[in-house]
C-alpha cells in the first residue's frame, strides 16, 4: 500500500488521539442544554421502577432511546473499540453506528468492521457509515452497498462533513451533486438512509431536501459536542491550515436549536439528536424538544477503549438519569416526556 493510500488511516489515528487526549481535546461551543429547564413535578404519582423508556429505530425496539454515535472506523485500535461498543449495545438494548467504513472497505484490513459485529449484536439497530463526499466517486453506490453488506446493517448513515473536509488539507472540496447521489443511494441501497451531520447541525431547509431525496432518518449532530474543525486545527502541520480551521471551532447550529427547527419542519420524520449530549438529563431535554433518539460518541469513547463493562456502566448511568428526569416531570413514558412542561427562559435557543 502506498503512502497516499495510508493517509486516511493515519488521519483516523490522529482524530482518535486528539479526541482522547484531555490536553488537546478541542474546546467547543456550548450546545445550550443548560438553558432548557423542566418544571419540576413534586408529586409525580409514578413508580420510578416502572418508567417505560422503550423506543424504536429502523423497525427494532430498544430498551432506551439511545444511539452509540459514529466514532472510529478506520484505525487498528478500532477493532477492540467496536467490539466493546457492540457487545455493550446488545447488553443494553440500544442502537449503534460504526464510524466511517471507507478505510476498511478500501484496504485489505477490515479492522473489525465485519459481520462479526452483527453476531455480537444480533438484536439491536446497527448502522453502517460512509461519507457523503464518497458517494460522488465512481464506485460510490457500490461502496454504500458494500458498507451495509459488510455488517448486515439495518441502515446506512451518510455523514455530511462539509466543514471538516473544507478545512482538512487533504479534504474533499467538490460537493457538487452530493444530494443527487444521496437520492440515488436511497433508491439503490436495500436499507433506509440516515443523514447525519458531524457537529455543525442541520437546518430545516437541508433536512427537508434530504427527506425529499429519500432519506428516512435525520441525525442533526449539532454544535456543542466535538468540533471537527478544531480537531483538524489540532492536527494541522501548517500554521495557515491551523488558523483557517480554528476560526470555525465554534461554527454551527447548536443541537437544541437544530432539533427544534427540524421537528417543526418535519413533524413525522424519525429524528436523532446528537452533539453535546452529556448525560441522561440532556437526553430528556432532547426528547422534549422533538427528538426520538439521542446519540453520544465522544462522551463514551474513553470507556470504549477500556472494556465492554465500562461502556455498559457508562450507559446504565445515562439510562438511570433519564428515568429520574421522567419521574421528576411526572412522565410515565417518552410520549409523556414530550409533553412535559418547561420553565420559561429568555435564553432558550431559537430554532
Curated annotation (Swiss-Prot):
InterPro entries: Aldolase_TIM, FMN-dep_DH, IPdP_isomerase
Catalytic activity: isopentenyl diphosphate = dimethylallyl diphosphate
Principal location listed in the UniProt entry: cytoplasm
BP-aspect Gene Ontology terms: isoprenoid biosynthetic process
Protein name: Isopentenyl-diphosphate delta-isomerase
GO molecular function: FMN binding; isopentenyl-diphosphate delta-isomerase activity; magnesium ion binding; NADPH binding; oxidoreductase activity
Binding site for substrate: 11-12, 100-102, 164
Positions bound to FMN: 69-72, 100, 129, 196, 226, 276-278, 297-298
Binding site for Mg(2+): 165
Keywords: Cytoplasm, Flavoprotein, FMN, Isomerase, Isoprene biosynthesis, Magnesium, Metal-binding, NADP
Needed co-factor(s): FMN; NADPH; Mg(2+)
Lineage summary: Bacteria, Pseudomonadati, Pseudomonadota, Alphaproteobacteria, Hyphomicrobiales
EC number(s) from the headed UniProt entry: 5.3.3.2
NCBIfam families the UniProt entry points to: IPP_isom_2
